[in-house]
Amino acid sequence: MRRPRRPGGSGGSGGSGGLRLLVCLLLLSGRPGGCSAISAHGCLFDRRLCSHLEVCIQDGLFGQCQAGVGQARPLLQVTSPVLQRLQGVLRQLMSQGLSWHDDLTQHVISQEMERIPRLRPPEPHPRDRSGLVPRKPGPAGELLTQGNPTGSSPAAQGFPRPAGGRSWGGSPLSSLQAELLPPLLEHLLMPPQPPHPALTYEPALLQPYLFHQFGSRDGSRGSESSSGVVGVGHLSKAEGPALFSRSASKAILGTHSGHSFGDLTGPSPAQLFQDSGLLYMAQELPVPGRARAPRLPENGGNRAEDSSEGHEEEVLGGRGEKSPPQAAQPELSLQRLTAVLAGYGVELRQLTPEQFSTLLTLLQLLPKGTGRNLEGAVNVGGADVKKTIQQMQRGDPAEALPPTPSLPGYLTASPASSEVQQVLSPGFPEPPHTPSPLGSSSVLLEKKSPLGQSQPTVVGRPSARPSAEEYGYIVTDQKPLSLVAGVRLLEILAEHVHMSSGSFINISVVGPAVTFRIRHNEQNLSLADVTQQAGLVKSELEAQTGLQILQTGVGQREEAAEVLPRQAHGISPMRSVLLTLVALAGVAGLLVALAVALCMRHHSRQRDKERLAALGPEGAHGDTTFEYQDLCRQHMATKSLFNRAEGQPEPSRVSSVSSQFSDAAQASPSSHSSTPSWCEEPAQANMDISTGHMILAYMEDHLRNRDRLAKEWQALCAYQAEPNTCAAAQDESNIKKNRHPDFLPYDHARIKLKVESSPSRSDYINASPIIEHDPRMPAYIATQGPLSHTIADFWQMVWESGCTVIVMLTPLVEDGVKQCDRYWPDEGSSLYHVYEVNLVSEHIWCEDFLVRSFYLKNLQTQETRTLTQFHFLSWPAEGTPASTRPLLDFRRKVNKCYRGRSCPIIVHCSDGAGRTGTYILIDMVLNRMAKGVKEIDIAATLEHVRDQRPGLVRSKDQFEFALTAVAEEVNAILKALPQ
């Protein structure tokens, strides 16, 4: 016979994960129409492979469909190489999307099964063969005939002879397991169900991680039978009763203790399949046509109560017109039968006489005490099964399935076959509780409370167990701990405590810990004993596994999931040190951020003061008094060569402007001395209320209409002045006198200096006269901030134009960029060519602007003048002030400090365009309104000033700021007018 090939060949790669594919294939639902049911393999895992005329016979591995009982086939000799070979084959079939119902799957499996060696079962005793079917028809025979119409009765299956030489002779049902009573009852009471319709293939069932949803690694989902006990596993809601379940196949195989399964070499089947996903369980698709079909009672007697559907009452309602005879039956038997039927929602009066006689005979044939256990199982566990199925259908992984207790029986299995049982029970590992000893009349049942807590109940004796399930755990230093490493650790621990590795059940990994439970063992070791021994042999376990064991103990599942990871964290010193450092770094970061915020706030308050302090001489701020100004005036007067008495001021301050063009030395007229007047009376305006409101409404509408404002600005940008030549400014000798090459004065509108008085012997300076209405007298001179080599030209322009007011709109340095050179002395006096400038006072009016007073003396003519500089500090380059109020207050100070204006005001920023043009536009428009002009066109006014100097008002924001400032000033004027 051909030897099976080793893994790694064509059969597949083997190893963990392959058995997950095996389980998914075993759980695939649906049957293609072309699949033949003759000799179909896998019926132990999917009973729908066999038709209602076929039976599923045991072949030692998957099960095979056969028409009729026939002759028992030899069992397969399953060895480790065989299992590995099948694992690879099933993995390849799984990768192709095939299931048990596909022809290709059946063909391949058939070929592989032919290669497996066979074992001939021992010849049964003549009494055994005669005991399979009753010699005389009787109630028990009727029961088997009615209860198993599909041929799934134990006799039809050809049950092997029980171990120990027991036979089926004598009473036909004397050795029938108590677990088989509920299926027989259900087949007896319920009519045969039609076969399943073809189900569709569900790819989601192939997900290898369905274990976390319906698996039973944690021990809370699944069932276990003690050795040799036939257990009925959990079935989906859509699946009808079947004796050929996965747990049933495990019990059938367990009866062959005399075969060669205990002599296997190499790793045991349980070790091969444990980490390969064989314990995974998938939920079958519900069948609409079978939604009301009865389910196989779980736990050997726990039948789900479908009281809401009332299926049993509907089926039996028409059969029980008359009550069965009860007087002739023993009272005890009637009580037992009543208790059993109560679990199914059936009353005695609903039974036919034939059904009543059959059930009563069956109860009498059962061993004494079994009925009582069954009654408790039916009454206690029915509601839990229904709840469990509903939770599985909802896919709720948080609610654990109730454990399925096992009932005592007579079929036993050898230790060697128990390993094969684990392999052939893919969906059901061992139960989470320690089973009662064989033959005990007490059955431990566990109910699930609404909070998910396990509540064990013992039928027949008081409860001796705590209400919560306990698990042993071993915490390691490896996180996450793999399942393979956890199983390896438990195998080594089993060797040290002289236990079988199969004694560990419900093995799972929670973070760095492996949790487990202990089944009943020969040494009678409990969880506490095993964990204590693990602590004693800690060093040996660490040496053999390479893991560091941090803690061992016994606790609940919740503790293993929640408490253990925290303990592992607390044990690691490096982790605690890192967490402490991170926390300290976070606190330090918060403190640093708070300190930076406070420093920035303090710096913002001191920035203006420091900036103002840098503009003036040291120690000069406290000495600027009006007395000092008077002393300076007296000092400058005594130094006059002509020693004239100062005359009465003339109404016009430009009456002596012509003296600038005279070569003879002339006295300095008082008209060129600006007399400060710090009055705060409101400006006199010739605006009436109606005109003011009209202008204000127009300005507000202009500002609200953003589209109109944008179109107006676009038109202003497209405007070109005529003429617009700048030849003088672009001359090679004058290029270095320009701060910005884009803002140059027009040839027809520029200030010309006297060549004979200029140190550079040139008449050029980057300055433009701005005429308001009188071409003979400009109202403003717009100029750039003086450069270091043009300061003398600037003072010459101030002297020759007769200006007494300078409006400076830029700081000297902004964001590290020099905006303007200092053209006045820090303290005392400074000489610029022939012009001596003496700083008289520097007064900080507010945080936004300050005022300086100068004496300007021409050393050639010995003439002295007084002038005032208003320096605005809160206007950023190419931007606008944060509010219009500071600039409007600044403008009022400029206009109120001097009576009349007969000479131009010098206005400069850095480039002499953006901020300079905005201030001139605001002041010009407001002056026109103060004179009573009825029509105001700000855009036309801007075009007018741009005809005289290019680039005035550089941005749309500056233009909008000018409109806003005009509107607010008009509003202030209207409030000041008498109502």
Curated annotation (Swiss-Prot):
The disulfide bonds in this chain are 56-65
Record bears the keyword Phosphoprotein: yes
Q: Which GO terms describe its biological process?
A: insulin secretion involved in cellular response to glucose stimulus; luteinization; positive regulation of type B pancreatic cell proliferation; response to reactive oxygen species
Q: Where is this cross-link: Glycyl lysine isopeptide (Lys-Gly) (interchain with G-Cter in SUMO)?
A: 754
Q: Which CDD domains match?
A: R-PTP-N
Glycosylated residues in this chain: 506, 524
**Which residues of this protein are annotated with the site description Cleavage?**
448-449
Chain segments carrying region Sufficient for dimerization of proICA512: 449-575, 601-732
| Lumenal-side segments | 38-575
Domain called Tyrosine-protein phosphatase: residue spans: 709-969
Q: How does it sit in the membrane?
A: Single-pass type I membrane protein
- Write the protein's name: Receptor-type tyrosine-protein phosphatase-like N
Native organism is Mus musculus
Q: For bias kind Polar residues, which ranges apply? A: 145-155, 414-424
TM spans, by residue?
576-600
Can you name a GO cellular component term? axon terminus
